[in-house]
Amino acid sequence: PMSDVFSFKDGDKNITLRYDLSSPLARFYAQNNQELPSIFKRYQIQNVFRNEKAGNGRYREFMQADFDIVGNVNPAQANAELCNLISSTLADCGLKKDQFTINVSNRKIVQGLIDDLKISEEKQTKVIRAIDKLDKPGFGLKGVEDLLKKERKDQSGAITKGADLSNEQAAQILNFLKIKDLKKLKETLKNPLSQEGIQELENVFQLLGYGSNLNQVKTNFTIVRGLSYYDSFIVETNLNFKVTNNKGKEIELGSICSGGSYAKLISRFRGVDVPGTGISFGVDRLLFALIQLNQIQVQDQKPVLVCVMDEKYLKNYYEIVDQLRDNNINAEVFLSTKKNLGKQLDLAN
């Protein structure tokens, strides 16, 4: 969304800060695909920038850890592998299996419904974003209904324009959002595109059944991901516990890892569709939760400068530094030829 992007001018240059890590990956793959393996796996950890309201675990500059599989892949296998990666990573972070849920769906399911309802193309983005708000704090079915119709007024009085759907169109979407069971969904939605999405989801679950992480993965047809480049499988991971904000109030933190499949993203740079699927951990948000669970101890540890009082003892000074570094303490020996203790302490300060 352009409103969420930090953009400005530097003289005659248009500057935009990095919004995510998926678009740069798509450009890199499009430019270098001849030199890359047919199945390209990549991870990237880097800061991104969002021009949106900050809050607990939500920042305007934050770190993402992305994992992607691009190329000639079996989509179900790639998506199942990423679900396993989410589960094993969170377990390695100290989270128990009942402390998080990996919600999955398929964008084709809701797109088929939108096509059946003959919702115009200019309204579809607003519809998708409205559905994506269902599980967000302060929304629920009533909030989504308002966004599907004329407008929604939040607690602060701010008004968001809705998709301006008819009552019948809005009612059909709200009925869809109440369905929880994959079998019932298959019986309800007859659109071929929706059926295709349901089958793709069943294929992922079949593969997940071969491993030990099936219990954490649940269908949730209300997740659609607000970014337009996701076109089939989508995943969103939420914590099953609340955290305490800086005002002492318990809150839901939101998604800590999300992603999906994006065959058409690379085509923007290369001109042909290339299968790709990926996930992104919100590192800052995850750390916020882990610190509250005492899985990570935050230490205010200061670096150490070993002062040089006599050069004949340099060997001893470096031995001290080695011992400090072995205990994960940042340390260094004073390097200047000026041996005045006051000058050395000035550097330390």
Positions of predicted regions on the chain:
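Acidic, His- and aromatic-enriched active-site or binding-groove loops in soluble protein domains
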Residues: S3-D12, L117-L148, L239, V243
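Positively charged, Gly/Ser-enriched RNA/tRNA-binding surfaces
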Residues: D10-D12, L21-Q34, F40-K96, K108, ...
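A generic structural motif
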Residues: F100-N103, K126-I131, A331-L341
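Glycine-rich, mobile lid/loop segments that gate access to catalytic sites or pores
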Residues: T101-G112, K118
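Internal hydrophobic scaffold segments of catalytic domains
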Residues: L113-D116, T125-I128, K153-A158
